[in-house]
From Swiss-Prot:
Protein name: 6-phosphogluconolactonase
A Pfam short name: Lactonase
Pathway of action: Carbohydrate degradation; pentose phosphate pathway; D-ribulose 5-phosphate from D-glucose 6-phosphate (oxidative stage): step 2/3
Record flagged with keyword Phosphoprotein: no
EC number: 3.1.1.31
GO biological process: glucose metabolic process; pentose-phosphate shunt, oxidative branch
Gene: pgl
Source organism, top-level taxon: Bacteria
Catalysed conversion reaction: 6-phospho-D-glucono-1,5-lactone + H2O = 6-phospho-D-gluconate + H(+)
Family: Belongs to the cycloisomerase 2 family.
Biological function: Catalyzes the hydrolysis of 6-phosphogluconolactone to 6-phosphogluconate.
Record keywords, A-Z: Carbohydrate metabolism, Glucose metabolism, Hydrolase
Amino acid sequence: MKQTVYTASPESQQIHVWSLNHEGTLTLVQVVDVPGQVQPMVVSPDKRYLYVGVRPEFRVLAYRIAPDDGVLTFAAESALPGSPTHISTDHHGRFVFVGSYNAGNVSVTRLQDGLPVELVDVVEGLDGCHSANITPDNRTLWVPALKQDRICLFTLSDDGHLVAQEPAEVNTVEGAGPRHMVFHPNRQYAYCVNELNSSVDVWQLKNPHGEIECVQTLDMMPADFSDTRWAADIHITPDGRHLYACDRTASLITVFSVSEDGSVLSVEGFQPTEVQPRGFNIDNSGKYLIAAGQKSHHIAVYEITGTQGLLTEKGRYAVGQGPMWVVVNAY
């Protein structure tokens, strides 16, 4: 298996393309100059395209991914109705979802042969919209509205329109600020990192009564932490055994173990990392974690070790200015 790591640096308007080997070493392959401040990125389900959101001219750009070395070539672009904060796709590669924190909306752009062609829906009134997360069955889009302490739930129609479900939302505790999410591989649980109180909520997608329920809320900060809480990103290993979340004020990655059924998290430790870690990701083997320091202008590679999933630093690398996003592609 070959793996390519992409890092987005908006201040220098660059995407760095790296080869990741089996020992956890990165080798720089390409630096792409992007026409705008590049922030969120996602790889298409068929691994042929990288979609990125740029500002201040709000657009989604599509880059073709070379199958042999992961090199990027610009392919297409499409306008967006707000500044892109988060970007994702459905599992069939038919639609791109973009959440906009500043505009308070989520948009759906149709893909044709992997390329963005037209905007098909926009849902407004999502104050502080910070991500759009499709469930593993490709039916429900979970959209955290950070400023409203709620996660809105939409059914994705065949033509890409979003229809509010019943119930139309679930609520966090007041002042939590739901931000980013991941789903357990067993499709039964979702995990949401809350920016403003640096906690993680565990959501049972459907209990026997057909309801969505928060079954656990866990503080992700050390007991002696007293500064402003400012959580950012969350990811789970492919086997569902280890979960990680980061806080930018503390420059920490919190390590969680996940119970076998996915319902319970336990804090295993805290890993100091790059200054102000805005984004990170886990490789497809579940062996390495790559974190970006928005203020250090570096990325760091960690090996995921032992039954607890603790992190051991393997190396750090200079990237562009203000790196914010990391994605990994395997082929």
